[in-house]
Amino acid sequence: MIKTDLTVLAVDDDIINLKLLKSMLLKSGYVKEVIEAKNGSDAIGILKNRDDIDLILLDIIMPIMNGIEMLNVVRADDNLRQVPIVVLTTDETKKAEALECGANSFLMKPIRGDELVQKIKSVIV
């Protein structure tokens, strides 16, 4: 049975995308808190200071530290590697690279609320 009090870290450099994700997640009935980060570097800082993140939604193309770089850092860290990561992208070619780097799954943008809920259910056990 899936938890209904998830804490999700949403990582995207586009503020509008972050707001839409947050709205969809909070309306899903499964998420109690959405933490936002504008790049991979900020997200790593959040992950190092919190131990309650249940899921990461990660954009690939971002400044400072992109999604692939962040995936590599997270998967190399013994304390973080177990956190499920769903990659969000508009670039079909980035899916395979993200999965090879340790992403659990992916969603193509633009994201629909029903797809997001199904993806959450599939990666959170």
Residue ranges and their predicted role:
Residues 86-88:
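Hydrophobic/aromatic residues positioned on beta-strands within the core alpha/beta folds
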Residues 69, 91-105:
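Alpha4 helix (beta4-alpha4-beta5 surface) of REC/receiver domains from two-component response regulators
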Residues 36-45, 67:
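Helix N-cap/capping motif at the beta->alpha junctions
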Residues 45, 68-81:
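Short amphipathic alpha-helix used as the core "switch/output" element in two-component signaling
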Residues 15-35:
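Two-component/phosphorelay signaling modules centered on CheY-like receiver
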Residues 59:
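Active-site residues of response regulator receiver
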Residues 111-122:
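C-terminal output helix
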Residues 62:
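Receiver (REC) domain active-site loop signature in two-component systems and cognate sites
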